[in-house]
Amino acid sequence: MTKESIKAREIKRLKLVNKYYTQRISLKKIIIDQRIPNEERWNAVLKLQTLPRDSSPSRRRNRCRHTGRPHAFLRKFGLSRMKVREAAMRGEIPGLRKASW
């Protein structure tokens, strides 16, 4: 099990990403657009740097909802492979069953 502080940190990052998403996207569009004057683009870069570091989506880490485990995470279920297996064996995930051939 992951420490509660690490889970809380991920939740905080998710909130920051959602809060600054539109602002970050608009600044990145300005930075990429070659038709905009260089000075204005440079100002956009400086504004982007002033945003909180944790507001960047790449700082987030996918974690299991139950355990907080960062590795072997299955996006479709939001769980780690072990918790998916346990839930499948109990029949809690509709349409998912153990393979046999």
Swiss-Prot record:
GO terms for cellular component: cytoplasm; small ribosomal subunit. InterPro entries: Ribosomal_uS14, Ribosomal_uS14_bac/plastid, Ribosomal_uS14_CS. One of its GO terms (molecular function) is rRNA binding. PROSITE patterns: RIBOSOMAL_S14. GO terms for biological process: translation. Keywords: Ribonucleoprotein, Ribosomal protein, RNA-binding, rRNA-binding. Binds 16S rRNA, required for the assembly of 30S particles and may also be responsible for determining the conformation of the 16S rRNA at the A site. NCBIfam families: PRK08881.1. Part of the 30S ribosomal subunit. Contacts proteins S3 and S10. Belongs to the universal ribosomal protein uS14 family. This is Small ribosomal subunit protein uS14. It comes from Blochmanniella pennsylvanica (strain BPEN). The gene is rpsN.
